[in-house]
Amino acid sequence: MVLVNFRLVAEVSSGSDIGSLITDNLEGRAAALFVILAGVGASLGKPAWHLALRRALFLFVIGMLNMLIFDADILHFYALYFIVAVAFMRKSSNWLLLGAAGFTLTGFVAQLVLNFDTGWNWHTLGYVDFWTIEGFLRHSLFNGWHPVFPWAAFLLWGMWLGRLKLGRWTVQIGMVLGGALLAIATHKASAALISDPKIGALMSTDPVPAGPLYMLASGATAVAVLGALLLITPLLLALPLIRRLCDAMIVAGRQTLTHYVAHILIGMGTLEALGRLDGSLQPIQIFWISIAYCAFAALFSWLWSHKFKRGPLEATMRLITEGKT
């Protein structure tokens, strides 16, 4: 997330260095993984529908405020995804899969029949009429950075995954192999179809616009990554040094909302104050700046956790939506 967004706002193009290679492969995939993980969390946590709606409202307000300074905000999209999740929480696993397919198909049909460029200034990556009702609905549902159609499919897919026996090694291996094979097959299909003059533009695995092959490739990649992490975590935790590093990462992972907002306000704000959001940085420079910021954020989380159980924004959301500290 930090690698992709820092490079985006710094107006740095991809290069041939290792940092660009890593960032290129994360672009679109990291966001998809986060939404899928949110779905997994929704299944495992099983929040009451009214609590889920209150959390969605909180995220929507924070996200809309964030949109004032960062056009690629994802929080207000998360709010809409969680509203979708509420409608599916008590549905069967088959309904979750049907819902995911339905959101993907609806998004694809909309891309075929509507003009995806409407509202966009691709030179500045700005959305000219977002703050109108028509523009907001179009951006949120159809052609924004992470529109509900089809991106809500990732959340439903994650909810389906959350109902599996994720602690079983057989399930984990199935996730790794199945996800990897589907991702490879989808990329090969994209390479074969992308030259088609009629539908080639929608057969890409790029995240904008999020066509069906992107949804398949990113969803499959996320499943493979999640399965691999679940598989190797017990082995890593057996090593004392790795266990301490994992503990630090777990602490940071519990403060993702805080880190998301902070990487915009503090990270991008610092770069802007230094006059570095003008394309003057090299790809490898913005990569290492991003890595350094992540290290700083992890250190903050570790220090904060010694005094408080939850991150600043996580605690605020809990206080506002549940009345608890």
What do these predicted regions represent?
Residues M1-T325:
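Alpha-helical transmembrane segments and their immediate juxtamembrane cytosolic regions
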